[in-house]
Amino acid sequence: MLFRSSGRIVDTIPIAVTKDLMLLGRTKFEVYCAICHGLVGDGVSLVATQMSLRPPPNLHQIRNPGPGHVFQVITEGFGLMPSYAPQLSAHERWAVVAYLQALRRSQAGTLADAPPDIQQKLRAEVPR
């Protein structure tokens, strides 16, 4: 479960992305990442307001972070962010990567991006 293959950072998640993996990723993100990056990854959190030197980035504004790059940052740390390898197994780190990909898509998505049956359900549930 390395983030590098033949010296290159991998561009796909090397394990099956399942609902259980996504739920694990969400749980671990909420415990270890959201405290600084915010629950939706926008860099808005109570801790971030106290970080005068350099606040955590809005994860949605980072240009095309491939899965291997995100895994590497979680594993090794970056800037003021420490490594989370001691707290998260490789499987859990890939789960966070998978969840972050879904989170990014959810924040940039529109109703038209959802399948027709989901669009219909959302239109019925959301008041206008």
Please provide the spans of the model-predicted regions.
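Amphipathic alpha-helical recognition patches that constitute DNA-binding helices
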Residues: 24, 58, 69
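Sequence/structural segment immediately N-terminal to covalent heme-attachment motifs in c-type
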Residues: 19-42, 75-76, 96
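Short Fe-S-cluster ligation motifs
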Residues: 62-77
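Amphipathic, alpha-helical segments enriched in basic
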Residues: 4, 8-11, 34, 49, ...
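Electrostatic cytochrome c docking/interface patches
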Residues: 1-28, 120-128
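Flexible coil segments in periplasmic/lumen-exposed cytochrome c-class electron-transfer proteins
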Residues: 7-8, 30, 39-42, 46-47, ...
